[in-house]
Structure formats: C-alpha cells, structure tokens
Curated annotation (Swiss-Prot):
Protein name: Dihydrofolate reductase
Reaction equations catalysed: (6S)-5,6,7,8-tetrahydrofolate + NADP(+) = 7,8-dihydrofolate + NADPH + H(+)
Pathway this chain belongs to: Cofactor biosynthesis; tetrahydrofolate biosynthesis; 5,6,7,8-tetrahydrofolate from 7,8-dihydrofolate: step 1/1
Chain's role: Key enzyme in folate metabolism. Catalyzes an essential reaction for de novo glycine and purine synthesis, and for DNA precursor synthesis.
C-alpha cells in the first residue's frame, strides 16, 4: 500500500530551496509517529536535504543514477522498483519530493496531509488533485503556540476507488 505524507500551505506549497519553508515541530512529531516502523520512499534531493537515514524506518531512495550509494538506505532507480517494494499490505510512505509525488500519485492509496493555513514563498508544490476522488477519514486541528506559530490541521484521506485511476 502506498501512502503519501506531506505538509502544504494554503497554495499547495511544500518546499523552498530543497527545504521546508516553515518550522512546525508538531508536524515533525506527527511525521515521526506515523512513519516509524515503516518503509519511507524519497527522491535523492529529499534525502540530501534530510542528510541521513531516518531511524526506525527502512529508507528507500529513488534516483536515476543507479551507481549512487546512500549509506543506510536501499537505492532504487525506477518507479517499478518502488511499486514492487510497496505491492504488499504493508504501508509504504512517500515523503517527497514534488516530482516523486507527481509520478506516484496514480498509485497512492492514502494521503496524510498537514494543511497549514498560511501562505509561504517557495518553489515546490504538491500536485493538484480532485478531492472528490478521496474520502476524508480523519481530521485533527493542530495546536498553535509559540513553537508552532501557524494554524494547521492533520488530515487523512483514502482513495474512494482503488482502481488506480489516478485521482488527479
């Protein structure tokens, strides 16, 4: 099963200069809680922005340079490799970047979205998609405070039709 986990602003922005445009510790804690013990799939640039494999997860890096080595990670060179890894019932999490979200969106079964009710400057966006193809399963309002200075909510969607039709 392929799940996406991401945070985006009011304009679907997810990144700026290969980093997050915001600092939201509660979202990082949510990400850790949801993905711990699972496989996480990321593009090369996302791995480089993190700088290391994330603990208690199987880290999988997708890169078009098949000779690349990322210590502590499994390296794959195609979307077919990702689909093979995630073909079973175990939940695999795509964690970025923007191109990987776009390429794998037709295969996504579940979306874990942190929606930040603020507008930021940046250069990477989550792909547009038709929310009518997705069922909102859970919603939790985040707590705005001095460390988390924006209004935000945690949303979880499941694809209504599992035909892999895309949902765009």
């Amino acid at each position: 099963m392929i799940s996406f986990i991401f945070a985006m602003d009011a304009n679907r922005l997810i990144g700026k200069d290969n980093d997050l445009p915001w600092h939201l510790p509660n979202d990082l804690a949510y990400f850790k809680k949801i993905t711990s013990g699972h496989s996480i799939i990321m593009g090369r640039k996302t791995f480089e922005s993190i700088g290391r494999p994330l603990p208690n997860r199987k880290n999988i890096v997708v890169t078009s340079a098949p000779d690349s080595e990322f210590q502590g990670c499994t390296v794959v060179s195609s979307l077919k490799d990702v689909l093979d890894i995630c073909s079973g019932p175990e939940e695999c999490f795509v964690i970025g970047g923007a191109q990987l979200y776009t390429d794998l969106f037709p295969y996504a079964d579940r979306l874990y979205m942190t929606k930040i009710h603020h507008e930021f400057e940046g250069d990477r966006h989550f792909p547009e998609f038709d929310e009518s193809n997705w069922k909102l399963v859970s919603s939790e309002q985040g707590t705005k405070d001095e460390k988390n200075p924006y209004d935000y909510e945690f949303l979880m969607y499941e694809k209504k039709n599992s035909s892999k039709a895309g949902g765009f």
